[in-house]
Amino acid sequence: MAEEENVVYVGSKPVMNYVLACITQFNEGANEVRIKARGRAISRAVDVAEIVRNRFMPEVEVKDIKIGTEELETEEGDTVNVSTIEIVLEKPV
């Protein structure tokens, strides 16, 4: 799987780890950073986007938000629906 550029995958680590990752991407010259999460990490992804915008980089705007559902297969062979979110933050040039 090719690694996407300027994407921060939110999981179970502390929120500030992901905030720092976003700020680092912007400081390295990225005009756009995508924050992706699924399941219980969705609320943490929203927190990351809001902290970046409100506390650290007020010039950054939310460009797009995409929500969806992924079907995952369990070890027993059942399928489970998992919600996903992608938040695109943009730094005006």
UniProtKB/Swiss-Prot annotation:
Keywords: Chromosome, Cytoplasm, DNA condensation, DNA-binding
Tagged with keyword Manganese: no
Keyword hit for Cytoplasm: yes
GO MF assignments: double-stranded DNA binding; RNA binding
Biological processes, Gene Ontology terms: chromosome condensation
One Pfam family of this chain: Alba
Compartments it resides in: Cytoplasm; Chromosome
Disulphide bridges, residue numbers: none
A single GO cellular-component term on record: chromosome
Family from the record: Belongs to the histone-like Alba family.
Its job: Binds double-stranded DNA tightly but without sequence specificity. Involved in DNA compaction.
NCBIfam families: DNA-binding protein Alba, PRK04015.1
Protein name: DNA/RNA-binding protein Alba 1
Organism annotation: Methanopyrus kandleri (strain AV19 / DSM 6324 / JCM 9639 / NBRC 100938)
Gene: albA1
